[in-house]
């Protein structure tokens, strides 16, 4: 895939970025260079290579996936003007 001047101008317009003619011409070369590098990366054989999250092997820290109320209901509603059994009471807004 290659980028031409019209594509650069269209993307700049969609992104609402003011780009002069000189800048647009320079960006054509830069974007084509980036896309060329990405195409080179797609040629690399990565079959059998395990995905990495870091350059050093480490286990991800995980917490237990448990649903709790946080045991802080009283603290949460402490500053509310009106509550009932740890629920906020608000005025009725729909008839």
From Swiss-Prot:
Domain of life the protein comes from: Bacteria
Catalysed reactions, as listed in the record: L-glutamyl-tRNA(Gln) + L-glutamine + ATP + H2O = L-glutaminyl-tRNA(Gln) + L-glutamate + ADP + phosphate + H(+); L-aspartyl-tRNA(Asn) + L-glutamine + ATP + H2O = L-asparaginyl-tRNA(Asn) + L-glutamate + ADP + phosphate + 2 H(+)
InterPro entries per record: Asp/Glu-ADT_sf_sub_c, GatC
Pfam families assigned to the protein according to its UniProt record, in alphabetical order: GatC
Keyword field contains Protein biosynthesis: yes
GO BP terms, alphabetized: glutaminyl-tRNAGln biosynthesis via transamidation; regulation of translational fidelity; translation
Enzyme Commission number(s): 6.3.5.-
Annotated keywords: ATP-binding, Ligase, Nucleotide-binding, Protein biosynthesis
Gene3D superfamilies the UniProt entry points to: Glu-tRNAGln amidotransferase C subunit, N-terminal domain
The protein's enzyme class: ligase
Entry GO MF terms: asparaginyl-tRNA synthase (glutamine-hydrolyzing) activity; ATP binding; glutaminyl-tRNA synthase (glutamine-hydrolyzing) activity
Sequence similarity: Belongs to the GatC family.
Assembly notes: Heterotrimer of A, B and C subunits.
Biological function: Allows the formation of correctly charged Asn-tRNA(Asn) or Gln-tRNA(Gln) through the transamidation of misacylated Asp-tRNA(Asn) or Glu-tRNA(Gln) in organisms which lack either or both of asparaginyl-tRNA or glutaminyl-tRNA synthetases. The reaction takes place in the presence of glutamine and ATP through an activated phospho-Asp-tRNA(Asn) or phospho-Glu-tRNA(Gln).
Name of the protein in question: Aspartyl/glutamyl-tRNA(Asn/Gln) amidotransferase subunit C
């Amino acid at each position: 895939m290659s980028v031409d001047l019209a594509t650069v101008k269209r993307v700049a317009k969609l992104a609402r970025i003011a780009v002069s003619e000189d800048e647009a011409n320079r960006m054509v070369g830069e974007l084509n260079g980036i896309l060329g590098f990405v195409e080179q990366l797609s040629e690399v054989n990565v079959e059998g290579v395990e995905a990495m999250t870091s350059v050093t092997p480490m286990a991800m820290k995980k917490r237990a996936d448990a649903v709790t109320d946080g045991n802080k209901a009283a603290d949460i509603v402490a500053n509310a003007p009106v509550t009932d059994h740890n629920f906020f009471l608000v005025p009725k807004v729909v008839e």
